[in-house]
């Protein structure tokens, strides 16, 4: 049975901001700024791997994003700080008569490491979701970033027949552009089923990591089983980019996690320890 969508006819728009900053103090990473306005919060503050890696679980208590809403994240890491940011569940973008927006600004100083590992975004039919991410790396800062998007509700048989999804991603190192991407997917567009588009897969995922790996590890990553279509490329400028198309978000998530398990020791020098929230 398909669950009814919430009635958002009289939904008051939420304008939420979350500003986070981290600094290295001795052998530990400490949060030095944690400011919020509106319904964006840090739910938990953890050191599951010891003091060097600060893990924060970010939550949006309303549980969904509707027309007129805006969410803004600003994340800054000082030299040699290490933060891992994730979420407890999927972000839901509801159908709406006007756009809802999310912006993410990331600034990493030399030697800093950020793992941005949220769970998926579900963009319901009729939603107007617009996301913009800008990342600035300084010196030898390290990044491990992913995002997953489910268009419609595949598990309920709901296609993305109306609305739109727009996403932009810019990554720079010392102001030099390393990666620029802008995509727009309109509900009902032929590209949803075209072999040069999503080929009928309603879930798309992207992983971007800074650094270079040897040919053997690259082949091991490419050999990982994927319940969909997945591949990984080493790009000039020291970026690894992985793509996945899948029929369900859990399949894309499983593939990204396995990639992270393989790549984290090579790129970040630590074994992969999955956040416990992923298992709840």
Curated annotation (Swiss-Prot):
Organism field: Pseudomonas aeruginosa (strain ATCC 15692 / DSM 22644 / CIP 104116 / JCM 14847 / LMG 12228 / 1C / PRS 101 / PAO1)
A GO CC term assigned to this protein in UniProt: cytoplasm
One of the Pfam families matching this protein, by short name: UreD
Function: Required for maturation of urease via the functional incorporation of the urease nickel metallocenter.
Entry superkingdom: Bacteria
Subunit (UniProt): UreD, UreF and UreG form a complex that acts as a GTP-hydrolysis-dependent molecular chaperone, activating the urease apoprotein by helping to assemble the nickel containing metallocenter of UreC. The UreE protein probably delivers the nickel.
This protein's UniProt keywords: Chaperone, Cytoplasm, Nickel insertion
HAMAP family, A to Z: UreD
Protein name: Urease accessory protein UreD
């Amino acid at each position: 049975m398909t669950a009814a969508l919430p009635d958002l006819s009289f939904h008051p728009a939420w304008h939420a901001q979350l500003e986070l900053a981290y600094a290295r103090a001795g052998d530990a990473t400490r949060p030095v700024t944690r400011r919020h306005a509106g319904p964006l919060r840090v739910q938990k503050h953890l050191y599951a791997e010891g003091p060097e890696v600060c893990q924060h679980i970010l939550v949006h208590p309303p549980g969904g994003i509707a027309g007129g809403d805006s969410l803004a994240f600003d994340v800054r890491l000082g030299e040699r700080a290490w933060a891992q940011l994730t979420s407890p569940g999927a972000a839901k973008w509801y159908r709406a008569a006007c756009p809802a927006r999310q912006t993410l600004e990331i600034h990493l100083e030399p030697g800093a490491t950020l793992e941005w590992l949220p769970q998926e975004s579900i963009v319901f039919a009729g939603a107007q979701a617009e996301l913009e991410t800008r990342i600035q790396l300084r010196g030898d800062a390290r990044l491990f970033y992913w995002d997953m998007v489910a268009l419609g509700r595949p598990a309920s048989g709901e296609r993305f027949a109306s609305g739109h999804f727009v996403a932009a991603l810019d990554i720079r190192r010392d102001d030099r552009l390393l990666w620029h991407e802008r995509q727009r997917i309109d509900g009902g567009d032929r590209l949803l089923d075209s072999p040069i588009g999503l080929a009928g897969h309603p879930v798309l995922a992207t992983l971007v990591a800074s650094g270079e790996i040897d040919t053997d590890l690259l082949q091991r990553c490419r050999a990982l089983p994927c319940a969909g279509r997945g591949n990984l490329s080493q790009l000039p400028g020291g970026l690894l980019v992985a793509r996945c198309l899948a029929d369900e978000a859990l399949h894309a998530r499983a593939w990204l996690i396995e990639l992270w398990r393989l790549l984290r020791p090579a790129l970040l020098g630590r074994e992969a320890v999955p956040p416990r929230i992923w298992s709840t």
